[in-house]
């Protein structure tokens, strides 16, 4: 009799434990589902494609630096000894995209090439840190920083959207922040360009990871000049497709490695 009672109690205990384990699995599944739903809801709130109203462009400044950011991307400039982009960050995934400093632009005037801004003497080109930046110098032939202004984006051309084609009434110009850097020719520059002023203009827009850039060249001298060509953007970016995990050729993203040149025969 005692043995039978013991067996019944043991069987009941096993059934209870099995039920508890089964119940625990259900509770775990429910908690996981709630976590996934919460994460999705959180991502939906932060997704700029769905609602980008929280990503407002702004400009922050310190003694020697200026940062243009909207919560999705940021671009940081150093102002002395010359203006140069020292950081270009993807805030959506936390990646730092810049590995080396380049001029802000390059102009070819009367057949001669002149950098605009930028710093030189970076000891290595595959990464960038503050120690490198502190020891870098301005090129003696580069257009040098004079001043900058910060304001709102401006209308580049008149635009009247046809409301019957649009579901949303978006403002024009697209709202955001605008920075204008003004440069003058270096003291050692040739006489023909000493009265040339260059403006490099950046606009970062609200609610989207979009940055526009343009340059303006003004000759205030008496002699005419010829602007043969220009490079408005030169960025030394971190490698996104190293050889250790490359796939087929169409899967490789090709980037400019040096001003004016591109990678070739990448798989070799």
Positions of the model-derived regions?
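Bacterial Sec-dependent N-terminal signal peptides
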Residues: 1-43
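Polysaccharide-binding surfaces and accessory modules of carbohydrate-active proteins
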Residues: 42-59, 64-68, 73, 87-268
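Short, surface-exposed terminal/edge motifs of secreted or surface/virion proteins that either
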Residues: 75-77
């Amino acid at each position: 009799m005692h043995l039978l009672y013991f067996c019944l109690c043991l069987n009941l205990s096993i059934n209870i434990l099995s039920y508890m384990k089964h119940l625990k699995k259900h509770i775990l599944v429910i908690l996981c589902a709630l976590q996934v739903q919460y994460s999705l809801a959180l991502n939906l709130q932060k997704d700029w494609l769905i609602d980008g109203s929280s990503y407002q462009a702004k400009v922050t400044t310190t003694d020697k630096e200026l940062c243009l950011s909207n919560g999705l991307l940021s671009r940081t400039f150093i102002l002395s000894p010359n203006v140069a982009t020292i950081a270009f960050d993807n805030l959506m995934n936390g990646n730092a995209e810049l590995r080396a400093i380049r001029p802000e632009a390059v102009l070819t005037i009367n057949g001669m090439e002149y950098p605009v801004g930028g710093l030189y003497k970076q000891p290595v080109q595959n990464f960038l840190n503050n120690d490198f930046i502190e020891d870098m110098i301005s090129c003696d032939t580069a257009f040098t920083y004079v001043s900058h202004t910060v304001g709102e984006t401006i209308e580049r051309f008149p635009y009247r959207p046809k409301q019957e084609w649009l579901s949303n009434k978006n403002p024009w110009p697209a709202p955001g922040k605008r920075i204008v850097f003004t440069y003058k020719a270096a003291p050692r520059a040739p006489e023909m360009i000493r009265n040339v002023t260059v403006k490099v203009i950046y606009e970062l827009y609200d609610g989207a990871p979009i940055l526009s850039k343009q340059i303006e060249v003004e000759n205030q001298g008496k002699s005419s000049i010829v602007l043969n060509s220009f490079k408005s953007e030169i960025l030394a970016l971190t490698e996104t497709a190293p050889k250790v995990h490359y796939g087929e050729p169409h899967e490789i993203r090709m980037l400019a490695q040096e001003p004016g040149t591109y990678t070739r025969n990448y798989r070799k």
